Design a protein with these regions (language model features):
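A generic structural motif
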Residues: 51, 429-430
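Active-site mouth of glycoside hydrolases
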Residues: 30-250
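Proline-centered flexible-loop/turn and helix-kink motifs
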Residues: 175-178, 212, 260, 336-342
Length: 462
């Protein structure tokens, strides 16, 4: 028994005061503000997610229950899970569960690919069980029904007719599970090839044939993309998934500006402890940068990821309470206790008028919107239309100039330390809402890094 871990989880649960926030699923796009997701009671839903891709295939039921309870205690309300997995780094060559149960009972004649029209009841019964555990913990599951990094070949060998039938099976089976969003794709590099797109679209359309209750989205290609880059998915998706391993502000704003009628969220960026070639990796500081950039560029939330828990590598339990997920919780609490859903990105710098750094539109390499993280000093800022809340994230410290007339008085100004979950008062606060004011954060936060969040709000604030 790991007493320190149990204690930390208990404290986290107290800190978040009911981290699941009682969302009434299924989610929908807000009719009043299509930039955000809401639950069935029209309560704004901030996506605070993890990415345990191999949850169903690599954990037992008991391990799944422990993992889900831990994530709920950390304030996580959403998970990305792949329904079937073939790649050895995530699952097993035959895609089986830990007990050897395979997802399908037959293969396509003359191939090694599963026949998608022959689902194995025992496999999907396990999926059902874990889905109910997630619901008990108040957690939304973003199900990838046929992840394209490993199963595109299988989809092509099945063809569109079988793929649609598979989707119909899923739609019928899961239409009454409230806590679902259907998330297609996954490193879908070749989506622009019509035959590839057609079979994955067929799965989605099959689901929609029997399930009109749940939203759909799709992850396209790395290193940077959004769902709406593929026009064939525009009639299907109700949520625009931004994907980038570069500074997130560029891709999130790209997705935000593609459509005012559906929300955007960051579906994948750098994972904690992970670093691939030509990527910056997932240190706590980089995770904070991508998270706060994302939130102040108009997103309805984001998914975190962890090298040890997306694959469930040996010893994954030792990484459940990592700095990255703890600081993700700090971020979530900062926004959840404020009207984050009314924030509008300050793209034209009428709010933060100077000191906002350089917006890196590309590279190096040239295909990298946002560029690398090291030295990236772009300040993302957002403001509510009524002027009751303004926020800015300063990744490298420095001094910014704020147009105080955009805010309502009296203006309480504080610095939030995103690494330590503490506020620091600013001399002279509260301020009048006239003229401009220069704000300079303390030199270093509690982690010894230069990033801070400026929080300006009418009255005393939460």
């Amino acid at each position: 028994m790991n007493i320190p871990r149990q204690l930390s989880t208990f404290v986290i649960g107290l800190f978040f005061c009911g981290a699941v926030y009682g969302a009434s699923y299924p989610l929908k796009v807000s009719s009043a503000n299509p930039r955000i997701l809401v639950d069935q009671n029209n309560v704004p839903f901030l996506v605070v997610g993890d990415s345990p891709h191999s949850l169903w295939v690599n954990l037992t039921s008991a391990e799944s229950a422990a993992y889900l309870a831990n994530r709920a205690a950390h304030g996580v309300n959403s998970l990305w899970v792949n329904l079937v997995i073939i790649r050895p780094v995530e699952g097993r060559p035959d895609c089986s569960l830990v007990d050897g149960t395979k997802p399908f009972t037959n293969t396509i004649s003359g191939t090694r690919s599963y026949d998608l029209t022959t689902p194995n009841e025992a496999y999907f019964a396990h999926v059902d069980e874990v889905m109910r555990m997630a619901e008990t913990n108040g957690i939304l599951v973003m199900i990838d029904p046929l992840e394209t990094a490993g199963f595109l070949r299988t989809a092509l060998q099945n063809g569109s007719t079988r793929c649609r039938a598979y989707g119909q099976f899923l739609g019928n089976r899961y239409k009454n599970f409230p806590n679902i969003i259907w998330q297609h794709g996954n490193d879908f590099q070749a989506w622009s090839v019509a035959t590839n797109d057609a079979v994955i679209t067929a799965v989605a359309l099959g689901i929609k044939d029997n399930d009109s209750n749940h939203l759909h989205t799709i992850e396209l290609n790395y290193q940077a993309s959004s769902s709406l880059d593929d026009p064939n998915w525009a009639p299907i998706v109700g949520l625009n998934l931004a994907y980038t391993y570069y500074a997130t502000y560029a891709e999130v704003l790209h997705a935000y500006n593609q459509s005012a009628s559906i929300p955007v969220f960051m579906g994948e960026a750098n994972y904690e402890y992970d670093k691939q070639q030509n990527e910056d990796g997932g240190s706590p500081r980089i995770l904070r940068m991508q998270e706060y950039w994302t939130m102040l560029c108009g997103a309805t939330g984001q998914l975190y990821g962890n090298k040890y828990t997306w694959r469930f590598l040996p010893g994954w339990q030792n990484y459940l309470d990592s700095p990255g997920v703890v600081q993700l919780g700090y971020m979530a609490n900062l926004f959840r206790t404020r009207k984050w859903y009314n924030l509008v990105p300050d793209q034209t710098h009428v709010f933060v008028t100077a000191g906002y750094g350089k917006f890196v539109s590309s590279g190096p390499p040239a295909s990298a919107p946002g560029g690398r993280f090291a030295g990236n000093d772009y300040v993302t800022a957002a403001l509510t239309p009524d002027g009751t809340l303004g926020m800015a994230y300063l990744p490298q410290g420095g001094t910014i100039t704020v147009a105080m007339s955009k805010l309502q008085k009296p203006i309480t100004a504080r610095w939030f330390d995103p690494s330590g979950n503490t506020f620091r008062a600013i001399a002279g606060s509260p301020f009048a809402n006239t003229g401009k004011h220069r704000f300079t954060p303390p030199r270093k936060n509690s982690a010894g890094d230069p990033d801070w969040v400026l929080v300006l709000e009418a009255g005393a604030g939460p």
